[in-house]
């Protein structure tokens, strides 16, 4: 697993989505992390210092795994870029076109009445 900076991570994520466009999947996980060992956490908590938590983001296509760590300062910029990438590559999640039940039953009634009138003439 490779820990990348924000922009290279987003570039790799884009390439993963493009490679899996025809066939395959991309999994993205987000997790709260302090990136410190348990011993360091205990020392900080005993001293009374607060631990700065970051967001650990991992992406994999089954073969290749990349990850990055996002702090509170970079969160808004990363979220905007991440949302843009997801919107661009989630074409399979388009809304289905559904027939409205009321409209379809009314249309069927109109068709049936018009065909019966034409038969009478």
UniProtKB/Swiss-Prot annotation:
Keywords: Cytoplasm, Ribonucleoprotein, RNA-binding, Signal recognition particle
Sample GO molecular function, one term: endoplasmic reticulum signal peptide binding
A cellular component term, taken from the record's GO annotations: cytosol
Keyword Cytoplasm (UniProt): yes
Record-linked Pfam families: SRP14
Biased amino acid composition, Basic and acidic residues: 103-112
Compositionally biased region (Basic residues): 93-102
Cystine crosslinks: none
Localization per Swiss-Prot or TrEMBL: Cytoplasm
Stretches for region Disordered: 93-121
Function field: Component of the signal recognition particle (SRP) complex, a ribonucleoprotein complex that mediates the cotranslational targeting of secretory and membrane proteins to the endoplasmic reticulum (ER). SRP9 together with SRP14 and the Alu portion of the SRP RNA, constitutes the elongation arrest domain of SRP. The complex of SRP9 and SRP14 is required for SRP RNA binding.
Oligomer status and interactors: Heterodimer with SRP9; binds RNA as heterodimer. Component of a signal recognition particle (SRP) complex that consists of a 7SL RNA molecule of 300 nucleotides and six protein subunits: SRP72, SRP68, SRP54, SRP19, SRP14 and SRP9.
Family: Belongs to the SRP14 family.
This protein's name: Signal recognition particle 14 kDa protein
């Amino acid at each position: 697993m490779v820990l990348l900076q924000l922009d290279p991570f987003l570039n790799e994520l884009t390439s993963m989505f493009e490679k899996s466009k025809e066939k395959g999947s991309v999994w993205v996980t987000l997790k709260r992390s302090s990136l410190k060992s348990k011993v360091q956490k205990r020392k900080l908590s005993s001293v009374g210092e607060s631990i700065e938590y970051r967001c650990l983001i991992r992406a994999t296509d089954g073969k290749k795994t990349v990850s990055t760590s996002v702090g509170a300062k970079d969160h808004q910029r990363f979220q905007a870029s991440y949302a843009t990438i997801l919107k661009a590559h989630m074409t399979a999640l388009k809304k289905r076109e559904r027939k409205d039940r009321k409209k379809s039953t009314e249309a069927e009634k109109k068709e049936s009445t018009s065909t019966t009138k034409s038969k009478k003439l």
